[in-house]
Curated annotation (Swiss-Prot):
Name under which the protein is recorded: Cytochrome b6
Transmembrane segments: 39-59, 97-117, 123-143, 193-213
Gene (UniProt): petB
Lineage, highest ranks first: Bacteria, Bacillati, Cyanobacteriota, Cyanophyceae, Synechococcales
One term of GO molecular function: oxidoreductase activity
Cofactor section: heme b; heme c
Protein localization: Cellular thylakoid membrane
Note on how the cofactor is bound: Binds 2 heme b groups non-covalently with two histidine residues as axial ligands.
Matches recorded under Gene3D superfamilies: Cytochrome Bc1 Complex, Chain C (1.20.810.10)
Subunit structure: The 4 large subunits of the cytochrome b6-f complex are cytochrome b6, subunit IV (17 kDa polypeptide, PetD), cytochrome f and the Rieske protein, while the 4 small subunits are PetG, PetL, PetM and PetN. The complex functions as a dimer.
Length: 222
C-alpha cells in the first residue's frame, strides 16, 4: 500500500515499530472484493460521504445559529446574507441532506434486491434499518431549526402524530414538545437531538455497521 521510499524512511519505521502501520495497511489493502461488485455497491459509501459533509457544514453553522424562537429565523438569515460563504455552507448542508436521504434509499433497495440481508448478515441489515430511521429523524429535526412557518407547522404536525397512540399518546406528545404546546422547549429539544444526540447515535451505528461488513465481507451474487 505504501511506496518503497515511504516504507524505508526513518519516520515511517518509527511509527511502524510502535503502531504496526504496515500490518494495518496490508490488512486493509488485501481485503477480497468479489468480481460481481459494481457501481451500485458504492451507494453506502456515498451516503457516508453525504453525512460527513453534513457534519462539517452543520458544525460550521453552529457558530452563528441561535436556537431560540425569537432569534432562530434571524440567525439563519444572518448566515445566508452576512456570513462569508454562509449561503454556500447552508446550501451545501441542505443539498447534501437531500442527497443523503436519496442515497440511503437507493442503498437499501440495492441491499434488498441483491439479498444482502440474508444469513449471516441479518444483524447488518437491522443496524442498517436503524441507520435509515436515524437519517430520517435527522431530516425531521433539522427541518424545524429555521423556525419559519414551514418549520413550525412541520414540528406541530410531526409532534402531534403520537397523540393517536392509545393510553400513552398524550404523554409522548408532551415529551416531544417539552410542554403542551409547540414553543421554545420544542425547539430546544429538536436542536439538541439534531446536533448532539443523533450524531452520537449515528456514529455508534456506523461503527457497528462497518465492523460487521468488515468481518463478513460483501455478499455474493444472487
Amino acid at each position: 500500500m505504501f511506496s518503497k521510499e515511504v516504507t524505508e524512511s526513518k519516520v515511517f519505521q518509527w511509527f511502524n515499530d510502535r503502531l504496526e502501520v504496515q500490518a494495518i495497511s496490508d490488512d486493509i489493502a488485501s481485503k477480497y472484493v468479489p468480481p460481481h461488485v459494481n457501481i451500485f455497491y458504492c451507494l453506502g459509501g456515498l451516503t457516508l460521504t453525504c453525512f460527513l459533509i453534513q457534519f462539517a457544514t452543520g458544525f460550521a453553522m453552529t457558530f452563528y445559529y441561535k436556537p431560540t424562537v425569537t432569534e432562530a429565523f434571524a440567525s439563519v438569515q444572518y448566515i445566508m446574507n452576512e456570513v462569508n460563504f454562509g449561503w454556500l455552507i447552508r446550501s451545501i448542508h441542505r443539498w447534501s441532506a437531500s442527497m443523503m436521504v436519496l442515497m440511503m434509499i437507493l442503498h437499501v433497495f440495492r441491499v434488498y434486491l441483491t439479498g444482502g440481508f440474508k444469513k449471516p448478515r441479518e444483524l447488518t441489515w437491522v443496524v442498517g434499518v436503524m441507520l435509515a430511521v436515524t437519517t430520517v429523524t435527522f431530516g425531521v429535526t433539522g427541518y424545524s431549526l429555521p423556525w419559519d412557518q414551514v418549520g413550525y407547522w412541520a414540528v406541530k404536525i410531526v409532534s402531534g402524530v403520537p397523540a393517536a397512540i392509545p393510553v400513552v399518546g398524550d404523554q409522548l406528545v408532551t415529551l416531544m414538545r417539552g410542554s403542551e404546546s409547540v414553543g421554545q422547549a420544542t425547539l430546544t429539544r429538536f436542536y439538541s437531538l439534531h446536533t448532539f444526540v443523533l450524531p452520537w447515535a449515528i456514529a455508534v451505528l456506523l461503527l457497528l455497521h462497518f465492523l460487521m461488513i468488515r468481518k463478513q465481507g460483501i455478499s455474493g451474487p444472487l
